[in-house]
């Protein structure tokens, strides 16, 4: 995915998007049914350059997801505050989650990835051997049944949606192994994409997830595809988006593993680094929560 494709999507939504009201009491412009594709054989790591990206937050959040995290205070200790707004006392109460402690997310992404089907008892409960470890199952299938069409992780659990501080946006991942080339592709479906704040994060996170799974399974990360349902821009982002559109993209950086990653639980952000990342300055707009 060249950055120009992302910029073109921003332009399309601003120019032709349908004006809609949403549950967060802020109008959006949106389109439906978009797809972005990134080919690792032709491009480097897709970390956007038209604004400075929050790399520490991207890596830390993915590590937290992959380890089944449900306590946002773990991220806070790493100076990552992207979940603070959705786990504040006021916000949790507005979701009817008055019994949750501040920082408690409920059975969100990480829980579904690693403990799917388990009953959510709280963030202090030991969920070992409870539920289905979807992520590890995918790693095992890639190694043992690489041509399986069931290499899938889903975060969409209708029964537990009311227990989540935020229903999942990126809800499904599917992997495809090309056994002849030794490559790994990933397609992600995202029901809702905040194109300015959320999607750049999701693009990098999906690419990083595929790189890590490829590293664990001895494959080469290849194509990532992101299919988007509701692709929207909030009205408080319009000026910022116009500023970003006016910036020329730079060359993507490179991703390097400093240490060999052998399992989904055994890596840390210190094992990964981004090289040669040049970007325009950050553009800050408050997150709508």
What are these regions (language model features)?
Residues 1-289:
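Terminal, non-catalytic protein-protein interaction segments that mediate quaternary/complex assembly
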